[in-house]
Curated annotation (Swiss-Prot):
TM ranges: none
Species of provenance: Campylobacter jejuni subsp. jejuni serotype O:2 (strain ATCC 700819 / NCTC 11168)
Signal peptide: none
Family stated for the protein in its record: Belongs to the class-I aminoacyl-tRNA synthetase family.
Name recorded for this polypeptide: Arginine--tRNA ligase
CDD domains attached to this UniProt entry: Anticodon_Ia_Arg, ArgRS_core
Protein's cellular compartments: Cytoplasm
Subunit structure as annotated in this protein's UniProt entry: Monomer.
Classification via SUPFAM superfamilies: Anticodon-binding domain of a subclass of class I aminoacyl-tRNA synthetases, Arginyl-tRNA synthetase (ArgRS), N-terminal 'additional' domain, Nucleotidylyl transferase
């Protein structure tokens, strides 16, 4: 709707301007401060300019009123125009707020947790954000592909195999073992040890078989990770292996050398990242000739940036903040525009239950498992809460609030609005088709504002995607639900003289809730279950 209004205004004003959304919809639905920017050029006061501009909009079908107020140009949308938009939305509900196909393309890499254990709650935040960003981008018409980078090489995979070997020796063979400083622990390691012992037999468990044991366990963990993601309604298009990039390392090093991006010193090969804004240079090849994790990651990012996407997006944990300058430096040395590599950071999550820290999982050692939280509160509540705050800010929430059936539980409160609308239609004995001819002319000011809010979802979705600020969607839903409940409590619907107008208004509210929830990966309920 906002883009339509913008274009209508531009036809008349014939110049560029900013279109704002005033908080008080009783004053205006849209406003522009254009008169202030024209004041110097026209040598007139903003008030006079705004008044002159307002006079150009007389008898325009889109607007109920266009007024000059303190230098601003305030626009109120007409009921007739809002009704036209409502008819379009209700006639084609599956296309409501969808964007036209765009040329811009994106590759999103996210989650990419080491396949050494189940996903924990820290992984879950980036996973939910990435999946929702994907749903939103595709809905708005962008080409958007997703990928999981499987870290299946290096020391962490070897440690997984070693941890299982030591668990077999200790818990099954009852040998005395000495654990290294770093190893994986938890019930899942014991379970893997039991399964491996049954599969391979006693003779298999020696140090020389650690790589084979690690590979077997890594594959098991990747299956588990995919199950964890599926449980939260998250689907990633493709999984790529770190090992598959081994053969490309030398070519990447040659390219970096050619562009003076690396140098040798102290028997190591260094990335000259300090030349590109990093705080210091970074080792990419050790003295023994082995590549560091950074080396493998550079090869992978070179491949991603070469695939022709307009932008490559990564979602990383906030602890990877210092990693950004070195990766962007490497991409610049390789001839890419580092602005086309976008990094979104997912901050830490603190989980409470009844005001106390949530218990760590025995299965995973010192972590809260994503699957445990989904089992307790459901994927809808998990997804909502992880989207309720900007991804790069710390998130603390008490899962007890998400089990309440009142306004303190936002998922319940919003779903209750959706279910309430279905209940009202049932009580009136009507369906949406029965109210399509209603013209909405009887709506009072609060009703018009509620209708405007429901129809303004497209603008919210565009803003949320462009700013990568997905919290705008749950914020919108909370306000929409609150305004609906208030309006419902203040207005008689069934049996009223304007019943059809109100039911048509409500159907738009329900459509907006269902559409926004769907993009968040949440099911809108037609009936509340107790």
């Amino acid at each position: 709707m906002k883009s339509i209004i913008f274009n209508e205004i531009k036809k008349i004003l014939e110049c560029d301007f900013a279109l704002e959304n005033p908080k008080d919809k009783n004053l205006a639905h849209f406003a522009t401060p254009l008169a202030f920017s024209l004041a110097k050029e026209l040598k007139k006061s903003p008030m006079l300019i705004a008044s002159d501009l307002a006079s150009k909009f007389q008898n325009h079908d889109c607007f109920e009123s266009v007024e000059a107020v303190n230098g601003y140009l305030n626009f109120r949308i007409s009921k007739t125009f809002l009704n036209e938009l409502a008819n379009q939305a209700l006639t084609n509900p599956n296309d409501f707020t969808k964007g036209e196909k765009k040329q811009e393309s994106f590759l999103l890499e996210y989650v990419s947790a080491n396949p050494t254990g189940p996903l924990h709650i820290g992984h879950a935040r980036g996973a939910v954000f990435g999946d929702t960003l994907t749903r939103l981008a595709r809905h708005l018409g962008y080409k958007f592909n997703t990928e999981y980078y499987v870290n299946d090489a290096g020391n962490q995979i070897y440690l997984l195999g070693l941890s299982i070997l030591l668990s077999v020796k200790e818990s099954i063979l009852h040998e005395n073992v000495e654990y290294p400083e770093q190893y994986y622990k938890g019930e899942y390691i014991v379970d893997l040890a039991k399964e491996a012992f049954e599969k391979f037999g006693k003779e298999f468990f020696s140090e020389e078989n650690i790589p084979s044991l690690a590979d077997w366990a890594k594959d098991k963990m990747l299956v588990l990770i995919k199950q964890n993601l599926e449980q939260a309604k998250i689907k990633i298009d493709s999984y790529v292996s770190e090992r598959s990039y081994y053969d490309a390392l030398n070519a990447t090093l040659e390219s970096l050398k050619e562009h003076k991006g690396i140098y040798e010193q102290e028997g190591k090969i260094w990335l000259a990242s300090s030349q590109k804004g990093d705080e210091k240079d970074r080792v990419i090849i050790r003295e023994d000739g082995r590549g560091t994790y950074l080396a493998a990651d550079i090869v992978y990012h070179k491949d991603k940036m070469s695939r022709g996407y307009g932008k490559c997006i990564n979602i990383w944990g906030a602890d990877h903040h210092g990693y950004i300058p070195r990766m962007k430096a490497a991409m610049e040395f390789l001839g890419f525009d580092s602005n086309n590599l976008e990094i979104i950071l997912a901050q830490m999550v603190s989980l409470l239950k009844d005001g106390e820290p949530y218990k760590m999982s025995k299965r995973a050692g010192n972590f809260i498992l994503m699957s445990d939280v989904v089992d307790e509160i459901g994927s809808d509540a998990l997804r909502y809460i992880f989207l309720s705050k900007k991804c790069d800010t710390h998130l603390e929430f008490d899962i007890s609030d998400l089990q309440k059936e009142d306004s303190s539980n936002p998922v319940y409160y919003i779903n209750y609005a959706h279910a309430r609308i279905h209940q009202v239609f049932a009580k009136a004995g009507k369906k949406i088709d029965d109210v399509m001819k209603a013209d909405l002319q009887s709506l009072n000011q609060d009703g018009v504002n509620l209708l405007f809010e429901a129809l303004n979802l497209k603008a919210v979705l565009n803003d949320a995607f462009e700013a990568r600020a997905l919290q705008k969607i749950p914020d919108y839903l909370k306000n929409l639900a609150a305004n609906f409940h208030k309006f419902y409590n203040e207005n008689k619907v069934v049996g009223s003289a304007n019943e059809n107008d109100l039911l048509k208004l409500f159907s738009l509210v329900a459509l907006s809730i269902k559409t926004a929830f769907s993009l968040m990966g949440i099911e809108a309920k037609n009936k509340m279950e107790h």
